Regions:
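Short active-site oxyanion
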Residues: 7-8, 63-68, 129-131, 179-181
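Active-site metal-binding motif and surrounding structural segment of the metallo-beta-lactamase
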Residues: 28, 32-77, 148-155
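Active-site environment of divalent metal-dependent phosphoester hydrolases
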Residues: 35-36, 50-54, 76-79, 91-94, ...
Length: 219
């Protein structure tokens, strides 16, 4: 008998995730290097226009006739390729029992993702559960506002090169206070170090380390 869930989260590598709702809606977040034959998408969301987050070839593989492609207003020109819908940061998009909100995501110290680009983090909500995909970001003040949003699962970059290292990423988790934190965009680092750090900083936050294409997390 399969486990019941409101959201099922599967890591596809890099910053790419497949999220399914309990009602069978299939959402892809930042799909990249997607294999042929993967399950088609109801909704695809890209956090920003860098090729490893808005990957046209992967998006095309996941498209069906009624797939909806979403992203922040700042990548409207990219979205046109798929007749996509831009969303203003802070606004939400509702689809059946699903709510999608885009919030700021940017670098503070590094030059790769400036705040002025108005790129996005993504919050998906369904059935009283939520998943936050931080996009390519560093620790930013807006994250502290997420502590009031009761995030179930936070997907946090920790590769260090273009985003955060383990120390900063775990600080973000402490700011956000999700029930579960999942490290991503990790560039083959030992993710157990992320787990050890966060367990010391806030043992109330559970760390789940997903395997690429492995068993998904059900919440």
């Amino acid at each position: 008998m399969s486990e019941e869930f409101q959201l099922q989260i599967e890591w596809l590598g890099h910053a790419a995730f497949r999220v399914k709702t309990g009602n069978g809606i299939v959402i892809y977040l930042d799909p990249y290097q997607i294999k042929d034959g993967e399950e088609k998408a109801d909704i695809i969301i890209s956090s920003h226009s860098h090729f490893d987050h808005f990957h046209s070839e992967s998006i095309q593989k996941l498209m069906k006739e009624d797939t909806i492609v979403l992203g922040p207003e700042s990548i409207a020109s990219n979205l046109k390729e798929f007749n996509g819908q831009p969303i203003k940061l802070g606004d939400s998009f509702d689809y059946k029992d699903l709510s999608i909100e885009l919030i700021p995501s940017y670098n503070v110290k590094k030059p790769n993702h400036p705040k002025s680009n108005r790129w996005a983090g993504i919050i998906v909500r369904s059935g009283g559960k939520s998943v936050y995909h931080a996009g390519d970001t560093e620790r930013i003040p807006e994250m502290k506002n997420l502590a009031d949003k009761n995030i179930t699962v936070a997907l946090l970059p920790c590769g260090g090169t273009y985003t955060m290292d383990f120390d900063e990423s775990t600080d973000c988790a402490v700011d956000i206070k999700p029930q579960i934190a999942i490290p991503m965009h990790n560039w083959d680092k030992d993710l157990n170090k992320f787990k050890e750090l966060l367990n010391k900083k806030d043992p109330n936050i559970k760390v789940v380390i997903l395997e690429k294409g492995g068993t998904p997390l059900n919440v």
